[in-house]
Design a protein with these regions (language model features):
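Thiol-based oxidoreductase modules, predominantly thioredoxin-like and allied folds used
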Residues: 82-95
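Conserved active-site alpha-helix within GNAT-family acetyltransferase domains
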Residues: 1-22
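C-terminal "cap" of GNAT-fold acetyltransferases
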Residues: 22-45
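Non-catalytic substrate-recognition and accessory regions of acyl/acetyltransferase enzymes
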Residues: 19, 28-32, 79-81, 98-99
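Structural micro-motif
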Residues: 100-109
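Non-catalytic, surface beta->alpha helical segment in thiol-disulfide oxidoreductase systems
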Residues: 110-132
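Local sequence-structure signature of Cys/Sec-based thiol-disulfide redox active-site neighborhoods
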Residues: 42-80
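A short acidic, often aromatic-flanked loop/helix-cap motif at beta-alpha or helix-coil junctions
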Residues: 23-24, 93-97
Length: 132
């Protein structure tokens, strides 16, 4: 699981221009004064997904392990516990840009709320902790 170190980026000239309640920050290093300022799409700002029952996993093929863990391990864990599971594979730029998460490699929601981008949630021990 890899996420950039925010402190390091801020020390090297990046500026935080937007922060979401679920912890995501949008950092920018502008090279031109008149550059367009990036922003989070409205669909990610609530930290929730449209499906409010059970587990929803959004993922893409950007990590070679994600498909195995989402469609193999996570499906089994959810089935064993009779938890509804919806898997949404993001296959186009438009799907990624309109998903409820800025982290499109893998994001997991439980009962509509964002939980994690950490793929290790698909292991039995971490999955069990999620449900407590």
């Amino acid at each position: 699981h890899f996420m950039s170190d925010t402190k390091w980026l801020l020390q090297h000239g990046f500026k935080e221009i937007e922060k979401l309640p679920n912890g995501f920050s949008l950092l920018v290093m502008s090279f031109h004064e008149n550059s367009a300022v990036p922003y989070f799409n409205d669909c990610v700002k609530s930290g929730e997904c449209p499906d409010k029952l059970g587990i929803v996993a959004y993922y893409s093929n950007r990590c070679p392990y994600t498909d195995y863990y989402v469609n193999g391990v996570l499906r089994v864990l959810a089935q064993e516990r009779n938890i509804p599971l919806k898997v949404i594979k993001l296959e186009t730029r438009e799907q990624a840009q309109n998903s409820p998460t800025p982290a499109t490699i893998f994001s997991l929601f439980y009962n509509g709320k964002f939980v994690t981008t950490d793929l290790s949630i698909c292991t039995e021990s971490k999955f069990t902790k999620l449900l407590k």
